[in-house]
Structure formats: C-alpha cells, structure tokens
UniProtKB/Swiss-Prot annotation:
Protein name: CTP synthase
Pathway connected to this protein: Pyrimidine metabolism; CTP biosynthesis via de novo pathway; CTP from UDP: step 2/2
Remaining remarks: CTPSs have evolved a hybrid strategy for distinguishing between UTP and CTP. The overlapping regions of the product feedback inhibitory and substrate sites recognize a common feature in both compounds, the triphosphate moiety. To differentiate isosteric substrate and product pyrimidine rings, an additional pocket far from the expected kinase/ligase catalytic site, specifically recognizes the cytosine and ribose portions of the product inhibitor.
UniProt binding sites for Mg(2+): D71, E139
Residue numbers spanned by region Amidoligase domain: 1-265
NCBIfam families: PRK05380.1, PyrG
Length: 542
C-alpha cells in the first residue's frame, strides 16, 4: 500500500520545503522504505525550461529529458532515486492537458471547470506512474494563501478525504520569526497560516516550524493549542550550517518517528544515520581548502547553479577539502583584465548558459586557464567557449564563433538540426519553439582509449544528461586535433563531440553535458572529484 505525504508551506516562500521533503525521504529510506518525491508547481509555464535562471533558479534535467524544478535535484541528491518526467508538474501543464482533453471531446460536452476537471487532473498526476513505492512525498510549491496554489490545495483536500488518515499525511512548514525588540519568537504568523489552511478544509497533521534558534516549550505548547495539532507533532526545523545536517537534525527532533506513528508503522529506534554524520563531519572539518572561480552570466542568483555548487561540495568531500567558490560575472572580463580576478584561484569552471552576452568573457577565462596551466572545467556552453578560444588563438581560426551569436566567419559551433534519441532520429529547425526543443536527457557517450576522461571514468561508455541546442561542428575536428585539442568523447554515431581535453595541460576538460546533475554526496561525480584533486595539486604549486 502506497502512502502519501503532502508538504505545504506558509507565511513566506523559500522556507525549504524541498529540503524538508528530501530529508524526510532520506529518513524513511533509512528505515527501509521505498520512496518517490514529487513537486507540484503553481505557475502557468508548462515547465521551467524557458524561465530566466535569475528568477527561477536552475533547470534540473532528468534522465528521460524533462526540464524540472531545482528541488528535484535535492530529491535525487538526498535519496539517490532518479527523478522522472512524471515527478514534476505545473499549472501550465495541467491546464494544457485539460484543454487538450476538451478539444478531443473527452468531457462529452460538459462545462469544463477547475472543480472537478482541473483538480481531477492534479490528483491523477499525484497518483500516476507508481510501482511498489511505500511513500510518495508531494511538495506543493508556493505559499498557502497564493491564488495560484488553490487548485492544488483543493486537490490534496480531496485526496485526503478519499484516502483517509491511514494513507495520507499533511505536513505544513511555517516560520517562527524572532523579534529582537521583544526578545522572543512569534507564533502568530504560524497561527494565521494554519488558519488559512483550515479555511481551505485542510487540517495539517504535522507542523514544521523554521527558526534560527531553539523553540521554547511554551511556544510549542501554544502552537499545539491554537493550531489543533499534538504537541509532539510540532517539529522544530532549526537552521543548520550545511544542508547535509538536515536529515540528522530532523531525526533528532523526531520527524520520522511522528510520521511512522501516524501510519502505525513499526520503528527501529536505533536508526543508523552514520553515513550522513560522516558527510557532515567532512564538511565541517576539512583538511585543506582550494579556491575555484565560477565564471558565469547568472551569478546574481547562486541558485541558478545549484547542482553545480553542490557537485563541487561533493568533490571537496571526496578529497577532504573545503571548496571556496568565487562567483564572477563573465561580462567583467569583457571590460577588465582577467588576471586581476583569476590569478589567485586554483581552478576555473565555466558553466552552461545561453546567448552572446558574456560569451567573450568566458572565452577570456578559458584562455587564462590554458595559458597559465590552471585547471579548467567547461560545461556545456563552457566547453563551446573553450573550443572557440583554442581555435582562435592556437589553431589559426581568428573568425571562429557560434551561430548562436549571428552568422560567424568560421561556424565552429552551430545549431543541431538532428540527432538520435534511442532508435529515433530527432529533427529541429531554427524556427522551432524554444520550450522543450533542446537535446534533453541522458545520452550515450563513447570515450577514447588512453584519454584523461577515460582514466577518470574508468569506463569506455558513459551516460550523461544534456540540455543544449548548439554543438561543436564536427567538421573542424581533424583541424583542431592537429593543433593539440583532443576530442576524447563522441556520440555513438561519431557525429556529436561530447568531450574535449588538452593532453598537455594539467587538467583542461570541456563537456557538452551536465555532469553536476548526477553528483550526490555519497557518490560524487568522478569529473568533479578529479577537478578538485587537480585544484589541490595546483594550490601546492602556487
């Protein structure tokens, strides 16, 4: 029997519902249960693929090619369960589905309404595509009281009535602000948030109260009294110094125990969270430190590179060092000399991105790394800019550029018009829609024997996740290799360059895919582990 846990939020946004869901999933896994986590987003975009990273944060891509919310990255990193397209839905996707059904005549002439048609579609999503999971955790995006969230909250109210308390649990995450002038935590915002939820017909079973300090018993009792929940079900969600402390902290506060008691499940009181504590200890007590510059164009919001930042943390954990990140806007290097900003770093990483803005700055960062023998890691757009830099300054192609920026003299990077997905050929054109038309999801890549990446992966064939519509032009492969740039990873048909490297450089690798999406604290991605190791070596040479 699959049990459902719905996680809502109140008072303010960005309280950490995604991390709370991921941490609870990890705790239930530690108790031997199989879990799946889902995110219901109340915005009208069909998916976040066309949303600005500086508004929404990164787009997390799944193996099956879905562009999803960054919280699915937390779910994967904490539980190790690969997310699927069916694990993220938006209001836009729900409405598109309902309207398509209406056009087909599926509703047989009925007046299509939010209730029951939209809410039924939401319920179908929440309960579909399941196998033998013990728990499904559904996070409801947004904040209680937002007009956009109402159909989703109504849907979970109906699901609760249909399933009963035996199969469903509702958790409400809220905020207890501290008022310095009063010298106390205030419970009134939480009371009003729960009142708003009750007005929608939903009684939460557990309250998770975010706070930057311990919550006195008097406040917990007060919340219990006015919000109509048991005192034991008022769970402190205290701030921690690393997100990997969250499962340990929530277990200490009894979150997983209360969930199991709600469902009348047997419990092993000696829950082993040793591996989580080991990760926390390594983060808190590193044996050294390296500095890595991330040269990007969306650095005004670090969540634009959430998986990237976490993957570098994982690489640091694997090497027992702290990775200090220096976030640099690539446009700076189009106005100023890169030396001033980069001469003190131990590694340079240029992540993915879109458009011409800041591209020349990324090219300058790649040039600095190549000429100064500083470890360089180019991801997606960062690989393309590294290849353009090499072509201009080493291979004698000063007009090399990308067709993404116009009509270049030397079209070194161009729009992919077709590629193979499984056994099918996919075709695209320059006039196609932007949403959902990129090369998305996991693809196979063959690694060249005796290459650095072959040594790093320890495998001949790998599968990595992609999100791009431009690719290095394979017709220039021989010309660039003659000058020393190795194309060490290719698509199975040999048409799409996936990895380049400089064999004579200490560590210079560019990849067309996004390895950060598959890195986990207990299974760091080998490229990030190796990159941080190279940064350690470089730090000893300075």
């Amino acid at each position: 029997m699959t049990r459902f846990i719905f996680i809502t939020g109140g008072v303010v946004s960005s309280l950490g519902k995604g991390l709370a869901s991921a941490a609870l999933g990890a705790l239930l896994q530690a108790r031997g249960y199989k879990v799946r986590l889902r995110k219901l987003d109340p915005y009208l975009n069909v998916d976040p693929g066309t949303m600005s990273p500086t508004q929404h944060g990164e787009v997390f891509v799944t193996d099956d090619g879905a562009e999803t919310d960054l919280d699915l990255g937390h779910y994967e990193r904490f539980t190790g369960v690969s997310a699927r397209r069916s694990d993220n839905v938006t209001t836009g996707r729900i409405y598109s589905d309902v309207i398509a059904r209406e056009r087909r005549g599926d509703y047989l002439g009925k007046t299509v309404q939010v209730i029951p048609h939209v809410t039924d579609a939401i319920k179908e999503f929440a309960t579909a595509d399941l196998t033998d999971e013990d728990f499904v955790l559904c996070e409801i995006g947004g904040t209680v009281g937002d007009i956009e969230s109402l159909p989703f909250l109504e849907a979970i109210r109906q699901l609760r009535n249909e399933m009963g308390a035996e199969r469903s649990l509702i958790i409400h995450l809220t905020l207890l602000p501290y008022i310095p002038s009063a010298g106390e935590l205030k419970t009134k915002p939480t009371q009003h948030s729960v009142k708003e939820l009750l007005g929608l017909g939903i009684q939460p079973d557990l309250l998770m109260c975010r706070s930057d300090r311990p919550i006195p018993e008097a406040e917990r009792n007060k919340i219990s009294l006015f919000c109509n929940v048991r005192r034991e079900a008022v769970i402190p969600a205290l701030d921690v110094d690393t997100i990997y402390q969250v499962p340990v902290s929530y277990h200490a506060q009894g979150l997983d125990v209360q969930v199991c008691r709600h469902f009348h499940l047997p419990m092993n009181e000696d829950l082993d969270l040793t591996r989580w504590q080991t990760i926390v200890d390594r983060v808190r007590h590193p044996e050294g430190e390296v500095t890595i510059a991330v040269v990007g164009k969306y650095t005004s919001l670090i969540d634009s590179y959430k998986s990237l930042a976490e993957a570098l943390v994982h690489g640091g954990i694997a090497n027992a060092v702290k990775v200090k990140l220096v976030w640099l806007d690539s446009e700076i290097f189009e106005r100023e000399d890169a030396v001033h900003y980069l001469e003190g770093v131990n590694g340079i990483l240029v992540p993915g991105g879109f458009g011409e803005r800041g591209s020349e700055g990324k090219i300058e960062a790649a040039r600095f790394a190549r000429e100064r023998s500083v470890p360089y890691f180019g991801i997606c757009f960062g690989m393309q800019m590294a290849v353009i830099e090499f072509a201009r300054h080493v291979a004698g192609l000063p007009g090399a550029s990308s067709s993404e920026f116009g009509v270049p003299e030397v079209p070194l990077v161009g729009l992919m018009t077709e590629w193979v997905r499984g056994n099918e050929r996919v075709a695209r054109g320059s006039g196609d829609d932007l949403g959902g038309t990129m090369r998305l999801g996991a693809y196979e890549c063959h690694l060249r024997a005796l290459s650095k990446v072959r040594e790093i992966y320890g495998a001949e064939v790998i599968h990595e996740r992609h999100r791009h519509r431009y690719e290095v032009n394979v017709t220039f492969k021989d010309q660039l290799e003659e000058k020393g740039l190795a194309f060490s990873g290719m698509s199975p048909d040999g048409v799409l360059p996936e990895i380049v490297e400089l064999p004579d450089h200490p560590w210079f690798i560019g990849v067309q895919f996004h390895p950060e999406l598959k890195s986990k604290p207990f299974d760091p991605h080998p490229l990030f582990t190796s990159f941080v190791q190279a940064a350690i070596t470089q730090s000893r040479l300075v």
